[in-house]
Design a protein with these regions (language model features):
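SAM-dependent transferase fold signal centered on methyltransferase-like domains
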Residues: 1-377
Length: 377
């Protein structure tokens, strides 16, 4: 188990793997724990939230954290930290590991988190990473099915701390989750690494909030906006249409830019996709959606800082055989992606008779007029 734990840590938590004499937790806690990148992100966020809190003249200069679910990615930024874990073996591991991880200021309590919460004196922040497995070890995603049930404890949590940070499954619908907390959510952080969505992080506060701040993070790419600014829209200026056949591309328009001016293509990163803030990025970066559900954008000029991948468009074709032959001339290998397209990647690859790989990327999608397009980049 220790060898397997070290192997998992070497990928997920290299600082742990480099620490001699560390005891690694069992597989399930290691699977749910934050990666080093996301743990460091949460620590920076906690520091920022604390600084804002300490700016209040009535706030104490001493800061304290209670982690009700045994995590401690944010413990270093607090003067005192309390780790609550109901499994005694994990508490023993924590007591051994904390001094090695420069967390000697952390107190370990072996008890049920809800019991501790009711007896808790006021603290600066409470952190929770609810267990996402049921009594049979199966994965759960709904908040009410996780342990502890943060929704049921929401009022008590905010009595005990002015700031509550909750880590949740990235599988959750964040819009519904924010609504479930009935105005307590002030910030939503959607965290991805390597373009894979890893965590949904909520910051709860006592005052009601109508428009939470949404932060989309993918490694070094960060985009922020307020949730009421187009967060649930696909994009502005798109109308659904259909076509009875694969007509030539000439004359096609989408949004505010004609297809003959499509020079650059943009693919949003995983956090943007999870947020669904397509109208936000369309307006902020002056890029135009290819179609209502394509989630791909184009521009006539290059755009700096787009939160995702950018490509120069070499050619565009409908599924018209003559156009395809001309657009794909000389191509034997390609990386293919499909968005709102009737064929799968495998089906399209077979139809185009292309092998996987190479330096060329093909994006197959459907435009605002319902035409099926293949963009070579």
């Amino acid at each position: 188990e220790q060898i397997a734990g070290w192997q998992r840590a070497s990928v997920k938590l290299p600082d742990w793997a480099a620490c001699d004499s560390l005891i690694f937790p069992p597989q399930v806690p290691m699977e749910q724990c934050s990666s080093q990148f996301t743990a460091q992100y949460k620590a920076r966020l906690a520091q920022h939230l604390l600084e804002n809190q300490l700016a209040d003249a009535d706030a104490s200069d001493s800061t304290s954290l209670v982690d009700l679910t045994g995590g401690f990615g944010v413990a270093r930024v607090f003067d005192h930290a309390t780790y609550v874990e109901r499994q005694s073996n994990l508490c023993d591991i924590a007591r051994h590991n904390f001094p090695l991880l420069v967390l000697a200021h952390a107190e370990v309590i072996n008890d049920d988190s809800t019991v501790v919460l009711r007896q808790l004196a006021p603290v600066s922040m409470i952190f929770l990473d609810p267990a996402r497995r049921d009594d049979h070890g199966s994965r759960t995603y709904a908040i009410a099915d996780c342990t502890p049930d943060v929704l049921a404890l929401q009022d008590l949590l905010l009595v005990k701390a002015p700031l509550v940070m909750v880590k949740l499954s990235p599988m959750l619908d964040w819009h519904k989750t924010v609504n479930d907390f009935a105005g307590a959510v002030h910030e939503v952080h959607i965290i991805s690494t390597g373009n894979e969505c890893k965590e949904l992080l909520l910051v709860l506060e006592r005052e009601r909030c109508a428009a939470p701040r949404v932060v989309c993070v993918n490694d070094e790419q960060i985009l922020e906006y307020e949730a009421n600014h187009g967060s649930t829209e696909d994009a502005d200026g798109i109308a659904h249409a259909s076509s009875d056949g694969e007509e030539p591309l000439a004359g096609t328009r989408t949004g505010a830019i004609g297809a003959d001016r499509w020079q650059y293509l943009y693919e949003p990163n995983a956090s943007i996709m999870k947020a669904g803030c397509f109208a936000v990025i369309s307006q902020r970066f002056d890029v135009h959606p290819i179609g209502p559900n394509s989630h791909l954008f184009v521009s006539a000029k290059p755009v700096d800082g787009f939160p995702g991948r950018s490509f120069a468009i070499e050619s565009i074709a409908t599924m018209n055989k003559r156009e395809l032959k001309q657009a794909l001339a000389g191509l034997t290998h390609a990386n293919i992606a499909v968005r709102n397209f009737p064929l799968s990647v495998t089906q399209l690859r077979n139809k185009l008779k292309l092998k996987d790989g190479g330096h060329t990327y093909l994006f197959a999608t459907t435009d605002a007029q319902g035409r099926h397009l293949v963009l070579r980049t």
